[in-house]
Amino acid sequence: MNCYLILTVALLLTSAMTGTTTAGQLNTKGVTLREDDRTFPCSSGLCACLPLDSYSYICLSPSSSTANCENDECISEDDW
């Protein structure tokens, strides 16, 4: 068996057993670890919506419906 495969499996098992995540996996807030949750994810003038069926923010116009957003809200840059 290839030693790289063994090492990869060992690292994955260690990660799974300790509850740690690798870059790109989701944290409890729904923002991927590649995104800094202190940095507003949208362009100026838009608001950030966390869809009910997703873990990544989408950017909406402030006048858009928030019915599909968590807590029925779209967060502005000022409120981020």
From Swiss-Prot:
Keywords: Disulfide bond, Neurotoxin, Secreted, Signal, Toxin. It is found in: Secreted. Expressed by the venom duct. It comes from the Eukaryota. GO terms for molecular function: toxin activity. Transmembrane segments: none annotated. This is Conotoxin Cl9.5. It comes from Californiconus californicus (California cone).
